[in-house]
Amino acid sequence: GMGIKDQNPKVLGNFTPDFSLSLSQNFSYKNWTLSMLIHSQIGGDIFSGTNMYGNGYAGNFTESLEGRAEWYASEDARELAGVATQDWTATGGYLIEGTYAEGSSINGQDVSGQTNQTYINPFDYYERVSRWQDEIHEPFIYDASFVKLRELSVGYTVPESFYKKLKLRSLSLGVFGTNLWLIHSNVPNVDPESSLTNGNGQGYELYAYPNRRSIGMFLKISI
């Protein structure tokens, strides 16, 4: 049931997006104003080293829980039945999507080309695909498409009656923020805009810091 690495090199992804799209909106009602910028990227791929190590060596990410409880239940049943590991067919665990390699057999029956139905220990799977040397990178290559609320601003123009004695022409105040909401992302646990470097390391991510979220206030006075 364990995956086999294809020895023939092939392209697994491309970090260049198909296109980017931004939507800017401005609203006003009486003395209130609201402006926002929604930005999206369609297409592009990213290899996430953070997800590779978080699921693999440490098993800290929730994605690595898939099949874990079922594997423990299968092992409890095996031990209760007094059956050796090599003689036991697991009833649960991690199931890799794919087909059996040519020449594969189970219990003496040829299963070449058939859909994989053999459960394996999730730890063994993630340990196999997260080794830096001779690892299988493909499970940690993600579609980097995303939608973000990039900017949001709310303002209020103070009525003249409140500052008339101050001899001001206008007075407005408000709050603003950037990178407030990752609305949609196909990349778990990390920001899809993360990168390893700003050079030719684009499309790779490893232990990247989250994109900074900024929140502030503004005060505009005309005299």
Which residues are covered by each model-predicted region?
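Outer/extracellular conduits and scaffolds centered on Gram-negative outer-membrane beta-barrels
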Residues: G1-I223
